[in-house]
Amino acid sequence: MNKVIGLLGPIGSGKTTVAKYLSEKYGFFMVVMGDLVRELARKKGLTPTREVLQAVQKEYVSKYGMDYFAKLVIKRIEESKSEKAVIDGMRRMEDVLVPKNYFKENILILLIDAPAKIRYERISKRIREDTPKTYDEFLEQERREYSIFNLDEVFKLADEKIINDSDLETLYKRVDEILRKYGFL
């Protein structure tokens, strides 16, 4: 049976950094939930801004059900035939509950967080269509996402929380400690 790590957290917290670390160091198969939505937006000929991605996600969820993307993630993991997988960017309650129900005790949900100012500095360095231009824009985007996805409640589903406000070495050490504690390494 697969060992799966699910990553939750606000934008710029370090979810993708952790996912890439697990993929590169330990061979975890990586599924990025946002990339699934970006693929669908591009197939429709749309520029994948944050607003467009939210609209595309909403369209597919209303058409195919709240668990559409979670089931797609499970399918990708199963098709990969990998023993270990990491899911980057779970946003909705179903994104967490459906894989938890499917993988049972073989899934570990980690919340990666950091202070807002640090997260804004991190995302300011990104070259993506959906990156906010100002700190106020960033905070407004975050308020919108917390409201749309009910993130406060989603984040409560985490088994462990990591505050990522230091360097990469500290982050990786903390990730390794937690994964060892749960028998995932």
What annotation goes with each model-predicted range?
Residues 10:
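P-loop (Walker A) phosphate-binding loop of NTP-binding proteins
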Residues 30, 109, 160-163:
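Short, well-ordered beta-strand core segments
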Residues 67, 128-174:
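Small-molecule kinase domains that catalyze NTP-dependent phosphoryl transfer to phosphate-bearing small molecules
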Residues 76-128:
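ATP-dependent NMP and nucleoside kinases share a basic, alpha-helical "lid"
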Residues 18:
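Hydrophobic positions on the alpha1 helix immediately C-terminal to the Walker A/P-loop
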Residues 15:
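Conserved lysine of the Walker
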Residues 28-98, 136:
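ATP-dependent small-molecule kinase phosphotransfer cores
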